[in-house]
């Protein structure tokens, strides 16, 4: 089941702190509907309803999707409205990392909010520009992020290799998790196809395939780190 990350800038999320901000309570949009993002993807109204109604696991709050670290706060309210997924949360009092994050948010040195979610193959359709998501299977976490939009893809690397089922999934993974542009991802897939085809025809291209695999491993991603 592929895991996806979608990030909005604070201008789009309309993030604001409650009162004087000392309690670290803030609210805004973690996702906006019918908006074509930098990947050419669109999330439709109602996409989060299934996850919000049925999942029992709490949605975690992290900074930059660092799920291996202590959460920086908790989400008190998650709800869809006509615009998107509106959230309200509180940064953890006494948590040094949360205090630093609050200062950065108020100063404007972090710029986005991002959702990490899982989808199944039937939950989205492919369009010329990207994908249209009509259903979210599980909302894993919502992070405050340093960078908005597609810059975050190279940091979060949330899309799972285990969820890859098609060539298009590979292209999307290379773009979303590794940070390649769409043209770079398509070009790399073409090289793989050529190498594998030659191998099947007995040309002995094992060295070329291994070189391509090594080039992927050397990409500056944060997978598993």
Curated annotation (Swiss-Prot):
Molecular function per GO: peptidase activity
Domain of life: Viruses
InterPro entries in the cross-refs: Peptidase_S78_dom, Prohead_protease
Biological-process GO terms, alphabetical: proteolysis; viral procapsid maturation; viral protein processing
PTM statement from Swiss-Prot or TrEMBL: Cleaves itself autocatalytically to yield the mature form of the protease.
Keyword entries, A-Z: Hydrolase, Late protein, Protease, Viral capsid assembly, Viral capsid maturation, Viral release from host cell, Virion
Compartment annotation: Virion
Gene Ontology CC terms, in alphabetical order: virion component
Enzyme active site: 65, 114, 141
Biological role: Protease involved in virion assembly and maturation.
Family classification: Belongs to the HK97 prohead protease protein family.
Name of the protein this chain belongs to: Prohead protease
Native source organism of the sequence: Enterobacteria phage HK97
UniProt lineage: Viruses, Duplodnaviria, Heunggongvirae, Uroviricota, Caudoviricetes
Gene name of this polypeptide: 4
């Amino acid at each position: 089941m592929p895991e996806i990350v979608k990030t909005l800038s604070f201008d789009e999320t309309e993030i604001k702190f409650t009162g004087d901000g000392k309690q670290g309570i803030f609210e805004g949009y973690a996702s906006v509907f019918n908006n074509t993002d930098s990947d050419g993807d669109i999330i439709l109204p109602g996409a989060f309803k299934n996850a919000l109604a049925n999942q029992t696991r709490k949605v975690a709050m992290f900074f930059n999707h660092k799920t291996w670290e202590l959460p920086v706060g908790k989400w008190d309210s998650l709800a869809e409205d006509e615009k998107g997924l509106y959230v309200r949360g509180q940064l953890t009092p006494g948590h040094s990392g949360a205090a630093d994050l609050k200062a950065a948010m108020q100063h404007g040195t972090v710029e986005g909010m991002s959702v990490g979610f899982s989808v199944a193959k039937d939950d989205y359709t492919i369009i010329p520009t990207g994908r249209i998501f009509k259903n979210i299977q599980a909302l894993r976490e919502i992070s405050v992020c340093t960078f908005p939009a597609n810059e975050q893809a190279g940091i979060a690397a949330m899309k799972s290799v285990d969820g890859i089922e098609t060539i298009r999934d590979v292209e999307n993974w290379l773009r979303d998790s590794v940070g390649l542009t769409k043209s770079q991802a398509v070009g790399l897939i073409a090289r793989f196809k050529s190498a594998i085809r030659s191998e099947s025809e007995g040309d002995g291209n094992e060295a070329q395939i291994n070189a391509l695999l090594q080039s992927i491993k050397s990409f500056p991603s944060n997978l598993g780190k």
